[in-house]
Amino acid sequence: ITSKDDLYVLSGTINATASDDGLRGKDSLTIAGGTVTVNSGGDALKSDQDNNDTKGYVSIVDGTVTLTSGGDGIDAYTDAIVTGGTVSITSGGGASAGKPSTGSAKGIKAQTYIIVDGGTTTIDAGDDAIHSDGALRLSSGTITAASGDDGVHTEVAAVLDGATVTVTQSNEALEGGLITISDGTVDLTSSDDGINASGSITVEAGLA
């Protein structure tokens, strides 16, 4: 399912099987309800508008969303936002498959910002489970992630200030430039670093 502009899913049931991307809104993709199931060879949910900073986002507000992808589960050129619903993502064959030698198989990927502020999100990713080229904030909701690489990765800054975050499998569980944990519950399992920051780490509460 593809739109050259904005793509909205408000209700109903969608079962999509695609050799490439599952649902793609060029300008934006919003799921605000319904039951959405995607099995794709490429990215499951995608928005790739690259010439407007207010576009290129993927937003899940509500609904039941189940994604199985050969590529990324969610791929947003700007922001990826989850504020509600039940989201289940398996990308790249899952954590047991390991990081692919080519291509990207991340659970949630965004170039600017990732926000999780509600809902229940479960990710089983061959690559990073949650990956932002910019910053991310996990404010509320429940996130459970298994990864063949990093559990939660950000190039700039990560703020965990209320969500319940559990990384069950990873090489590095939480990696970023600046990392702040100020609230919530954070439980990390890794084969390498639990928390790795190239800048500073601030822990005020929440680390299990």
Question: Which ranges hold each PLM region?
Answer:
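Acidic/polar low-complexity surface segments
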Residues: 2-14, 20-207
